[in-house]
Amino acid sequence: MSTNFSVPEPTPQLVKVAESAKEASISLGQSTNKQRCEALTEMANALNDNADEILKANVQDLERSEKEGLNKSLLSRLQLTKTKLKGCIDGVLKVSNLADPIGKRQLHRELNENLILERVTVPLGVLGVIFESRPDALIQIASLAVRSGNGALLKGGSEAKDTNQAIMDSLDKGLRKANVGSGALSLLTTRQESLGLLRLDKFVNLIIPRGSNELVQFIQENTRIPVLGHADGICHLYVDNSVDIDKAISIALDSKIQYPAACNAIETLLIHEDIAEMFLKKGLPIFSSEGVTLKGDTKSQALGVKNKADESDWSKEYLDLILSIKIVRNVNEAIEHIRKYSSRHTEAIVTEDKMVAEKFLSSVDSAGVYHNCSTRFADGFRYGFGAEVGISTQTLPPRGPVGLEGLVTYRYYLRGDGDLVKDFASGDRSFSHIDLPL
């Protein structure tokens, strides 16, 4: 997408939808924990009741998108199987079982007798979510929005339009049955609406883009609303020389082939030169049998990798069964390569040397840095967050998989009894600053 583009003003109809979402979000944010949990239960029930219609709509989307030439990785993300849908429904129920993120007192302090300060978590307000291909993302984000007391304007890709509409109909049915948050969730359906969303800074508190690098960059450059997200998912796995070869191959395979279209799948494998020959001799046939195309540097080509990796491959997110391989001298060279090419999403090291592992963990500045495990664990559900609205690679929090805690902010409450600053400025009164129990 070109950035030399003037984002149009939102239409009156879109402004009206945003106003309704804002009003509904205030009501939802003031609802009780029990009410929001009941709403999620009804949303899950409605999804389950309408599962056949949702899956039928998904087949229609898949058939149309395949005819239109949608690429393989996006088709993979678009597909919603019966098993995946059931997992999404279970995820909604698990979100309802998570601790209430609203109303948590983070600070409780006496400033002076009868002058008490509190810092308490509150909902953000309205989320603007733009996502491509994955209809399951709609379910995840909607459930987290409701649980955290936020409204949401959601725009999915046109390739998933029938699936998304069937899902939204079910979610809305659940909210109406629970009699809480009706109108808090709205599905945007046109490109004009998604562009207009970027100008709704009076109503939308956070934009969460989930899609291509181009999509994320375009949004970041064309809105005044805070943006949570990441562009590319260029993840690395480094195999050290102090390693169990079988363990390393197993972790590398899982990090690549378990779901290659995921943003937490590795795109580059770095191998210590001391064990490169042994690793590739055993690993190449296994990767080949799994249909993985390997592209290597000069050293790895000399050890059997058939395809050449050029400079652009080190910064490429394949989202497919393609893996770049580079042989490095040591952990320091691996770290330098990662610093140069990483998108700061997730990196991992396989080593039995704890000192080398700690060096890697403390030196790599990514949202997730792992030791002896697959990069595919970078996921809100696997972290125990219930689900995630997205993954943030920014340095400021929230960072990494963002669940409920990333969808609330805080507010300061100060309760007094006629207290005046002039009394403290004159010295007649003084601050006690005593921390009280939370």
From Swiss-Prot:
Tell me what reaction this enzyme catalyses. Answer: L-glutamate 5-semialdehyde + phosphate + NADP(+) = L-glutamyl 5-phosphate + NADPH + H(+)
The record ties this protein, via SUPFAM superfamilies, to: ALDH-like
Question: What domain of life does the native source organism fall in?
Answer: Bacteria
Q: Which UniProt keywords apply?
A: Amino-acid biosynthesis, Cytoplasm, NADP, Oxidoreductase, Proline biosynthesis
User: One GO CC term of this entry?
Assistant: cytoplasm
Query: Which residue spans traverse the membrane?
Result: none
E.C. numbers: 1.2.1.41
UniProt pathway annotation:
Amino-acid biosynthesis; L-proline biosynthesis; L-glutamate 5-semialdehyde from L-glutamate: step 2/2
Task: State the NCBIfam families in the record.
Answer: PRK00197.1 (NF001221), proA (TIGR00407)
Q: Which family does it belong to?
A: Belongs to the gamma-glutamyl phosphate reductase family.
Question: Could you identify this protein by its name?
Answer: Gamma-glutamyl phosphate reductase
